[in-house]
């Protein structure tokens, strides 16, 4: 709002000044300078205005989405608990079934690494 008032005052001052004063090269340069400033100021005011409008829209959207998100969370909480209750025993069972294979793989990997280290020691000696 302040920027709009400032821009309006500058525009009125330029309009009044150009009508009241004779045109000379220096005044023409000053008029161009102020015209450029006016253009930049108007662009800045427009950007600020759009930014404020965007922020307002985002805040309104958040305000509208909060009740919906609360409802979704209320509906999903029992579902998440149910899924966790069903998945936990399955995961534990899978872990018990895979443990022997993992242990065997680990022991074989350790054996291969020992052989590689022994060979590396033999090569460096």
UniProtKB/Swiss-Prot annotation:
Which keywords does UniProt give here? Antifreeze protein, Secreted, Signal
Record's superkingdom? Eukaryota
One GO cellular component term, please give it: extracellular region
Q: Which cysteines does the record link by disulfide bonds?
A: none
State its location(s).
Secreted
Which family would the database say this protein is a member of?
Belongs to the apolipoprotein A1/A4/E family.
Q: How is this protein named in the record?
A: Type-4 ice-structuring protein
Q: What's the source species for this entry? A: Gadus morhua (Atlantic cod)
- Which lineage do the record's taxonomy fields give for this organism? Eukaryota, Metazoa, Chordata, Craniata, Vertebrata
